[in-house]
C-alpha cells in the first residue's frame, strides 16, 4: 500500500501536504481513531505509514482480517464514521470536499452477495447523512457496478473518481477558491 505514496515522496501520514483524516475502529475497544497528518494525540495517529492507514480502512469486517498497528486491531472506520467531515473541520479545515460512492441498484438478477452489499450501502449511507450535509461539496462517484470487494477493479475505480473530479472541477475550484 505504500508504493503509490512513496512515488509521490510521501512515507508517513504527517508528510501529506493537505489535511487528511482516515477513520478506523479498534475492534478491541470499539473506539474510533483517525489516521491523519495534523495531530498526534491518543485517538489520532500521524506517525504511521500511509500504507498502514490504507490497510486499516480496507479491513472490512467479515472479509479481511483486522489491521494490527501497535496495540490496536483496526477495522474500516466506516463502521462508525464513513465520511469524517466533522473531524476534518475539528482540525481547522474551512471547507470540506466529501467523496461519496453511488451504490448500484438491485434488480431481479441480484444474488445474495449483491443484496448483502446493498444492505451495507444503506447502513453506510445512513451513517454518512450528517457528514454529507456538513460538507461544502459532495463529489459523487459512480462505480459502474463495481462492488466493495472487486479489488481487481482498483484502476477502474481510480478512473471513476478522476473522471468525476474533472467533470466537477469548475464547481470545486469555485467553492474552494483554487
Regions found by a protein language model. Give the residues of each.
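Patatin-like phospholipase
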Residues: 1-178
Amino acid at each position: 500500500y505504500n508504493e503509490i505514496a512513496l512515488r509521490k515522496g510521501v512515507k508517513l501520514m504527517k508528510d501529506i501536504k493537505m489535511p487528511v483524516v482516515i477513520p478506523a475502529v479498534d475492534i478491541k475497544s470499539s473506539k474510533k481513531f483517525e489516521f491523519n497528518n495534523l495531530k498526534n494525540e491518543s485517538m489520532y495517529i500521524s506517525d504511521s505509514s500511509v500504507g498502514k492507514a490504507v490497510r486499516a480502512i480496507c479491513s472490512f469486517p467479515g472479509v479481511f482480517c483486522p489491521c494490527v498497528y501497535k496495540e490496536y486491531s483496526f477495522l474500516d472506520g466506516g463502521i462508525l464514521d464513513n465520511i469524517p467531515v466533522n473531524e476534518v473541520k475539528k482540525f481547522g479545515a474551512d471547507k470540506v470536499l466529501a467523496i461519496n460512492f453511488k451504490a448500484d441498484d438491485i434488480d431481479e438478477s441480484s444474488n445474495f452477495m449483491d443484496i448483502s452489499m446493498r444492505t451495507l450501502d444503506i447502513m453506510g449511507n445512513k451513517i454518512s447523512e450528517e457528514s454529507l450535509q456538513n460538507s461544502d461539496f459532495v463529489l459523487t462517484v459512480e462505480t459502474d457496478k463495481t462492488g466493495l470487494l472487486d479489488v481487481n477493479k482498483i484502476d477502474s475505480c481510480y478512473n471513476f473518481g478522476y473522471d468525476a473530479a474533472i467533470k466537477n472541477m469548475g464547481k470545486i475550484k469555485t467553492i474552494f477558491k483554487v
